[in-house]
């Protein structure tokens, strides 16, 4: 598996457990890429849904992917603070085309005061049944949801107070 290079622009591709494409973010600038972690950033990038509909993101975002965690984190810079959208997902894979992961439906929305809501539990239950998620996957996803909530409470990793601002500053160097 090759890793994207710092400064390179690449897609992010989200799939479902059945292998079908879920969503594509057209352009993300790579800020850091190692075998353990990829950090990227985008601002007003085109997103294509599985049904072909498109929309544009509204604000700058820092995207955090970890090779050993079954979640990824998007920190969105808004006027009233940093909001986070966390996808419970497979660890990332990369190729020359994109950062890729399997989206497992459960999401966590985190507000600037670090309170959060767990989203899409009904969708997770439906897809778990429809796509026959193995018990092992269900167990891993629940464990990593708990890890994610711990990271939020501890302000660890992408939830650290300076994390999003620091990486956004680096992103600005590529947009000049």
From Swiss-Prot:
Mg(2+) 1 binds at residues 87, 103, 107. Its cofactor is Mg(2+). InterPro entries: DUF402, FomD-like_sf, Ntdp-like, SA1684. Pfam families: DUF402. Mg(2+) 2 binds at residues 105, 107, 120, 123. One of its GO terms (molecular function) is ribonucleoside triphosphate phosphatase activity. Its EC number is 3.6.1.15, 3.6.1.6. The active site is at residue 23. It catalyses: a ribonucleoside 5'-triphosphate + H2O = a ribonucleoside 5'-diphosphate + phosphate + H(+); a ribonucleoside 5'-diphosphate + H2O = a ribonucleoside 5'-phosphate + phosphate + H(+). It comes from the Bacteria. Keywords: Hydrolase, Magnesium, Metal-binding. Has nucleoside phosphatase activity towards nucleoside triphosphates and nucleoside diphosphates. Belongs to the Ntdp family. This is Nucleoside triphosphate/diphosphate phosphatase. The lineage of its organism: Bacteria, Bacillati, Bacillota, Bacilli, Bacillales.
